A protein has these predicted regions:
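N-terminal targeting leader peptides, primarily classical Sec-type signal peptides for secretion
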Residues: 1-5
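TRNA-recognition modules of translation machinery and tRNA-sensing kinases, especially anticodon-binding
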Residues: 7-454, 458-467, 472, 481-483, ...
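Conformational-control "hinges and anchors"
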Residues: 475
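Positively charged, low-complexity, intrinsically disordered RNA-binding extensions
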Residues: 478
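Acidic (Asp/Glu-rich), glycine- and aromatic
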Residues: 497
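Short, highly charged C-terminal tails/helix-capping segments
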Residues: 506-509
Length: 509
């Protein structure tokens, strides 16, 4: 059984060009001026040494990062002039004057930076190879901007900072998920020792800073207290007065940012629609994040729905202590740039951010007001199904996405807010006996790249006699720039089927 497929007739004259070549060899092409340079070996025989933008790394059995992911490193969309992510980043930065910005931090970090420094437990699913891209057991592509949090606190160059960067996660394939996306995190801290030297109360100093934040007139729902003993506790060593002041500064700062963002989005929307003017509303919701406490999410009522915009909270004191600034206390937040840009511009598909098509890029300018994105065409989709039996010894696991806590704010130890961060310990070697949905997603991305719009599990069952599990996935192929032919999608789909067998050991149905 080869599965179901459906394709509409193709119009190959829409755009002149060919499908991107599918490299099954583990090669990343670079440029003479730099970029990524990597040669040698096929996927099945992982290269021992790779060089990425002039930096050398040794790989081991943990290596699971395909060349297509490594090739994204030089793109740095958040730094490209007139790119919607750059415009969004600068809009947010404008609301934090005096904060030091870090926008070009290298994406390859140690597991200590990405996990240990934030108190991630050793058994946290975010450490798994099913969720994270590894070069070796000690080196990963950062899964969040918080990988740089401890180092930035340690450098202590400013009271407030903003970090914007590309981050990498093995995840679902659909219009709102991409293995490379962009986050911004911010933090603001105060020095208790300086307050003592000035013979001032720290809470009083923070309240004075609150008064400097621009006022707004939007409706804010915030029914909960600044902290709660059980739901949203204080950390050991933090006084109620300090936390109340820190929470007020955090919330007023982020409300100011959100007002700016959504007023810009409203202006863009007003230029193209006649919808009635609806006043902006925001609300604060108690939350749990492993490296902040107390913690909150900020939601905005937008076009009839409450949308979660960001996560934030009072920084876990062990992070500051281990960064050699135990005298400092403060807050941190994290926000996804693609999510905000999609709202700002009404961009319907996250893959568009990676497009080099002038019909997309020409719609954005840092020198002009924000305008709603106008789709240049909707080319027909082509779906194909693939069904297979798992190996008899395999167990199935879905995509966990555990590392996808609030960007730039958290970890996963319920007591992590008050306890010291544990030292790194030996991690068990990767296991290959179980099936994980993210492996299917990764193979689909490797074969089809941005030509695959989404991948969905449509059916599964266990055979009553053999106890073997059958899975069926629907692959939706769609090019954003031209119509795919049946021949092209058939070729892609056959490659995908072959790789499922080669990599996962499944039996096609």
């Amino acid at each position: 059984m080869t599965g179901t497929s459906s394709c509409k007739d193709a119009d190959t004259d829409v755009l002149d060009g060919n499908l991107p070549s599918i490299e099954l060899e583990y090669i990343v092409k670079g440029t003479e001026s730099g970029g990524i340079v990597e040669v040698v070996a096929t996927y099945s025989s992982v290269p021992r040494d790779i060089k990425i933008e002039g930096r050398s790394y040794q790989t081991d059995e943990w290596m699971n990062t395909p060349s297509t992911i490594l090739a994204a490193i030089p793109r740095r969309l958040h730094l490209q002039p007139d790119h919607p992510l750059t415009i969004t980043r600068k809009l947010i930065e404008s609301r934090f004057p005096g904060y030091k910005t870090h926008n070009d931090l290298f994406p390859i970090v140690t597991t200590r930076q990405n996990f240990d420094s934030l108190g991630f437990p050793l058994d946290h699913v975010g450490r798994s190879r099913t969720d994270t891209y590894y070069l070796n057991k000690d080196t990963v592509l950062r899964t969040h901007t918080s990988a740089h949090q401890a180092d930035t606190f340690r450098s202590n160059e400013s009271e407030g900072y903003l970090i914007s960067a590309d981050v990498y996660r093995r995840d679902a394939v659909d219009r709102s998920h991409y293995p490379v996306f962009h986050q911004m995190e911010g933090a603001r801290t105060w020095d208790r020792e300086q307050a003592k030297r000035e013979s001032k109360d720290l809470a009083q100093i923070i309240w004075e800073d609150v008064e400097k934040i621009p006022k707004h007139d939007i409706a804010v729902e915030d029914p909960n207290p600044p902290f709660h003993t059980e739901r949203n506790p204080l950390q050991t060593g933090h006084s109620p007065e300090e936390v109340e002041a820190i929470a007020a500064h955090l919330k007023r700062s982020l409300e100011d940012m959100v007002v700016t963002i959504f007023n810009a989005a409203k202006s863009a929307s007003d230029t193209t629609t006649d919808t009635p003017d609806e006043p902006l509303k925001v609300r604060w919701v108690e939350a749990y994040f492993p490296f902040t406490s107390p913690s909150w999410e900020l939601e905005v009522f937008w076009q009839g729905d409450w949308l979660e915009v960001l996560g934030c909270g009072v920084v876990s004191q062990p992070i500051l202590n281990n960064a050699s600034v135990p005298n400092r206390v403060g807050w941190a937040f994290g926000i996804g740039l693609e999510r905000i840009a999609m709202l700002l511009y009404s961009i319907p598909d996250i893959r568009l951010f990676w497009s080099s098509d002038e019909r997309f890029l020409s719609q954005f300018s840092e020198q002009k007001p924000i305008r709603r994105f106008v789709p240049f065409s909707k080319y027909p989709a082509c779906f194909k199904d693939v069904s297979f039996w798992l190996k008899s010894s395999s167990s199935a696991a879905g995509g966990g996405g555990a590392a996808a806590q609030a960007p730039g704010t958290v970890s996963s130890n319920p007591s992590g807010a008050n306890n010291a961060i544990p030292p790194a310990s030996p991690t068990p070697p990767p296991q290959s006996s179980s099936f994980h949905e993210n492996d299917v997603m990764e193979i689909a991305r490797e074969v089809g790249g941005d030509l695959i719009e989404d991948v969905r599990l449509t059916d599964q069952f266990v055979h009553p006699k053999t106890a073997r599990r059958s899975m069926c996935y629907r692959i939706n192929y769609r090019n954003l720039e031209r119509t795919l032919t049946n021949e092209e999608t058939n070729e892609l789909h056959e490659r995908l089927r072959a790789l499922l067998v080669e990599r996962l050991g499944v039996e096609l149905r």
